[in-house]
């Protein structure tokens, strides 16, 4: 969207310059005078400067708005939300994204500016139409069902690389699934020590019991919500995705605390580095422990 607007501004500049040059030939002063020509050139220079300034301000406007949102509270709730309590609870599955964005947690509207929201969808998810939105959201639905937690638990028990490789060969028929699981096992071994140290999980057993489904459920809810607000999908379509995420989360998780831990575990298995995991852990602690957190106001149970 930004690109289209910038293109329009440049096109307007070109049109203005063309009209100014045409005016130069239509409006003549007595022969030998360059006053008219100089005046036209001056106006063109002013127009160029104006467009450059406008484009620059436009490009940084949303960054400034994003910066100003950082001064809002951690938990922005709309007291006049039109959603039912149950619908608000489901929206809170995407709370991590809303806290990061300093946006609303309990409504379909995110609080993001239209241009910022649509640019993010296009840049990060290649979403700019109904079809592309459905493709991306269906992909996230599939990701919600890809749970390798039991396999990671077995790998923790086996410890040795060769034993784990044999286990994967014996377990998976599809080599792509085996490869994906192996990658998650590698990441689990890499980060389990820090996650225990940070108090996210007690041990390897809790890591594999909780799993990472909340990470994918969070993304599905947050992206479906943004797509609905941007009119790429209908609200009815959005709720189908949200309901699916809710069902997947409740298959293995029973509390907001477990859901929060599961988000960090999923972030780890997805490939986040130590810094990003530290940041997501801070947000989860706020959501779990802060008395003002909406996770304290709404039960996780249906």
Predicted feature descriptions by range:
Residues 1-23:
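N-terminal secretory/membrane targeting signals
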Residues 23-24, 29-35, 43-228, 232-235, ...:
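Polar/charged low-complexity regulatory segments
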Residues 39:
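Serine-esterase "nucleophile elbow" of acetyl-processing enzymes
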